[in-house]
Each structure stands twice: as C-alpha cells, then as structure tokens.
A protein has these predicted regions:
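Conserved SAM-binding strand-loop segment of SAM-dependent methyltransferases
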Residues: 85-96
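Conserved beta-strand signature within the Rossmann-like core of class I S-adenosyl-L-methionine
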Residues: 131-141
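Conserved SAM-binding loop
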Residues: 77-78
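S-adenosyl-L-methionine
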Residues: 1-38
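Conserved class I S-adenosyl-L-methionine
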Residues: 40-49
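Core SAM-dependent methyltransferase catalytic element
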Residues: 174-223
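A short acidic, Gly/Pro-enriched loop at the edge of an enzyme's catalytic core
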Residues: 99-108
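Conserved SAM/SAH-binding beta-strand->alpha-helix loop
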Residues: 70-72
Length: 223
C-alpha cells in the first residue's frame, strides 16, 4: 500500500507544479506560540505535503521536521527552503501508516487535512508536556460537498476532543465541513517522562532485534 500511496500522491502533487507556493494555514498562524528565549523548540508538520506550514514554523524559529510520503511534494518544499535560505528544516519521506515518533520530542505537532486514526497515539506521545497539537481536518459534513469521499478519513463529531481528553483545550471548532483543535499536553514529572522514554527505547530495541534484515530500496528518504 505504501508504494501505491507514494505513486498516487506524487501524481497529485505534480498537478501543482506550476501553481504558486501555498500560504501557511491561518489556524496555525493563530495558535503558534512566539519563541521568546534562546531555548531550542521543535515542531513536526505531519503529512506536510509541500511544507508550507512547516517552513513557516521554521521561519518563526522552530527546528522543524516535515514528514510526507510524496517525494514530489518534498522536492517542492526543498526548493522553497533554498529560496528562503532556511537551514532548520528536515524533510523526511516516510510511510505515515507505520509512524514511529519519539515520545516527548516536539513542542508543536501540526496536522492539516489528514486523518489516520492509528497515528493519533503516536501524535499524542510525541508532544512534550506543555507542548501543543494543532489539528485541522475534514469532518462528516464534507460529504455534502464530496459525497463519494471515504468516510474513514472524516472526523466524527467531537472526535478530536475525545482523543485529547485531559489536555487543555485552547480552541475547538466544528465549522461547516472542517474540525479544528488546539490542545496543550498536561505537565508531567521528570521521573514519569524519563520512565516512559526508557520504555519506548526498550520496546524499540526489542522490535529492531526481532525484525529480520531486508534490503530497502527507496523506502525512506531524507534531504
């Protein structure tokens, strides 16, 4: 499925080749904290496409990972990075269906126009205590505009709220066919954070040890 998805999304993004580079999403601009210290802050633009949101975060001072399955989209992001002389962006071609994110790594995780429910636990764990998720995607009302759209990729009523229970909700909107959420992860003690990070590393090492070596051909890619 990953190979088919790569081909499909590459073809989609080729249709945008001659169009102007898109602007970042207004909801992201509204809910991104301003960096006021010399501390390093990290952001993830998940399923980021051509990177318009991730590059904007980088311009605000965040060290940003842009992850997408499409090499064509990431190439467009790379060109724009060069134009803007941005050096604090990592462009990562990944199969998001098998997403594996380090816990407590990002100050911001943003997701726009993308929904895979099995990625939500990884998104939650990747946000630092005090960090935030900024999420915007289509909900079931989108069927009134595109009746043939696959309902697997549409949010149910209050679904994002349910998935981020216990987080501080800064904003939640269900506006026509779009649902938006900004939520802040609760603070946790250093001992809890350290214990969970160690559990993650142990589980990952065990999984790596039990995975047979295979030859990879262009499965992942990093600029």
């Amino acid at each position: 499925m990953a190979a088919e998805d790569r081909v499909r999304w590459d073809e989609i993004y080729r249709t945008f080749a001659r169009q102007p580079y898109p602007a970042p999403d207004p909801f992201l601009l509204e809910h991104t904290p301003i960096i006021t210290t010399d501390t390093e802050y990290y952001a993830l633009d998940l399923a980021g496409g051509m990177g318009q949101n991730g590059l904007w975060l980088a311009e605000q001072g965040y060290i940003t990972d842009v992850m997408d399955i499409s090499r064509v989209a990431l190439y467009r992001a790379r060109v724009e990075m060069t134009v803007r002389n941005l050096r604090n962006v990592n462009l990562l071609q990944v199969d998001i269906d098998t997403l594996d994110l380090h816990p407590y790594h990002y100050d911001i995780v943003c997701v726009f126009r993308y929904l895979r429910r099995d990625t939500l636990p990884a998104i939650r764990q990747a946000v630092k205590p005090g960090g935030r998720v900024i999420y915007e995607s289509y909900n079931l009302e989108y069927l009134t505009h595109v009746p043939e759209f696959n309902t697997r990729f549409l949010l149910q009523h209050n679904e994002l709220l349910d998935n981020f229970q216990g987080w501080e909700v800064v904003a939640h909107e269900e506006d026509e066919h779009i649902t938006r959420l900004t939520a802040i992860r609760p603070e946790e003690s250093e001992s809890v954070v350290k214990a969970r990070q160690e559990q993650y590393e142990q589980a990952r090492q065990k999984a790596d040890a039990n995975t047979p070596e295979v030859e990879h051909k262009d499965d992942t890619f990093e600029w």
